[in-house]
Amino acid sequence: MSVYRRRLSPLKPNQVIDYQDVELLRTFITDQGKILPRRVTGLTAKQQRAVTKAIKQARVLALLPFVNRES
């Protein structure tokens, strides 16, 4: 029987997720600009919803690209 280790969340429990913190948000998107799923990021459901909302708001305000185009 294999033993699974519980992943630690990359965010602190009370850390505020802000749409203006682009460097933090970039850790949760792929090179193509897609939002990483919860099973990859290791976030809680509540944190994942907050990150998703922040990324989408940052995209609308042109702080993050919708699609990362390689030229």
UniProtKB/Swiss-Prot annotation:
Classification via PROSITE patterns: RIBOSOMAL_S18 (PS00057)
Record-level GO BP terms: translation
Keyword Chaperone assigned: no
One family name in Pfam for this protein: Ribosomal_S18
One function term, GO molecular function aspect: small ribosomal subunit rRNA binding
UniProt keyword terms in alphabetical order: Cyanelle, Plastid, Ribonucleoprotein, Ribosomal protein, RNA-binding, rRNA-binding
InterPro entries: Ribosomal_bS18, Ribosomal_bS18_CS, Ribosomal_bS18_sf
Classification via Gene3D superfamilies: Ribosomal protein S18
Subcellular location: Plastid, Cyanelle
TM region positions: none
UniProt keyword annotation of Ribonucleoprotein present: yes
A single GO cellular-component term on record: cyanelle
Xref: NCBIfam families: S18
Family under the similarity heading: Belongs to the bacterial ribosomal protein bS18 family.
Complex and partners: Part of the 30S ribosomal subunit.
Protein name: Small ribosomal subunit protein bS18c
Source species: Cyanophora paradoxa
